[in-house]
Amino acid sequence: MAPPTLITANCCCETEVKYFKYCSTSLFVLILFNSWITVDLVAEKPLVDETYLFEYPTFFLVNATDGGALKGTDANPAMVDLFNEDTNFWNLEALSLFVETSKLADGIMMQTYFSLQISLSFAFSGICVKYITGLKNNIQKCS
């Protein structure tokens, strides 16, 4: 059965239920608001006015929306290095390191997750698509 699409603005609460029901085996999940897709389709889509939600299981919950403003509970101080407010771009090197160091020991899945919502109209460039493509092995389509 295909997973439901993300149709409301309440990403934190709604997505958590869907994530653990449909994607608990995925290390890194990419979700388009109106469909669930693979990274190959991301590279093919125009990088204008598209909004994606990235989820990663970790020890805290952070929402980054509206140009990268960080909000959440028990946020890791290291998150401040992930977004450059002067340029409105994500620090891909820091994000990559963060994802790598956030993997859970012994495969234990915590009940919170790291969610990063980005508007591609300002945040994504060609290099970012390459970065996501490089994570292909860790991105799975929910089915």
UniProtKB/Swiss-Prot annotation:
GO cellular component: membrane
Highest taxon in the source lineage: Eukaryota
Localization in the cell: Membrane
The keyword Transmembrane is annotated on this UniProt entry: yes
Keywords: Membrane, Transmembrane, Transmembrane helix
Membrane topology: Multi-pass membrane protein
Transmembrane residue ranges: 20-39, 113-135
Main location: membrane
Extra information: Partially overlaps ARG5,6.
Name of the molecule in the record: Putative uncharacterized membrane protein YER068C-A
